[in-house]
Amino acid sequence: MAYSPLPADLAQPKPATEHTKKTQARVREQLNFDDRQSFDDAQRGFIASIDPITIKRPDGHITFDLEQLSFLHGEAPDTVNPSLWRQAQLNAQHHGLYEVCDGLYQVRSFDIANM
């Protein structure tokens, strides 16, 4: 039996309220989501990643699967602040080894921290 912190009926997503929809729409109007410079910047220095994008224990059990974040490829739903959605896209979609500057390397997106 899988552990769930919430009963099944409470664990299901709910539609955004009208207030939430209006609030998210204001964020979309205030920020320039057509500017993709952040995505270009995040890709700079990319060297390599792993394929498939999963991390496994020696026994083969998957401990981390970035494929589970593929839902972020789309637009933010009305229930999510579009600015936070964009930040999640930047974090999840740019994974692997990067050279930040000469001789300084960074591993990104294989956990919540950068190493």
Explain the meaning of each model-derived region:
Residues 2-102, 107-109, 115:
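Metallo-beta-lactamase
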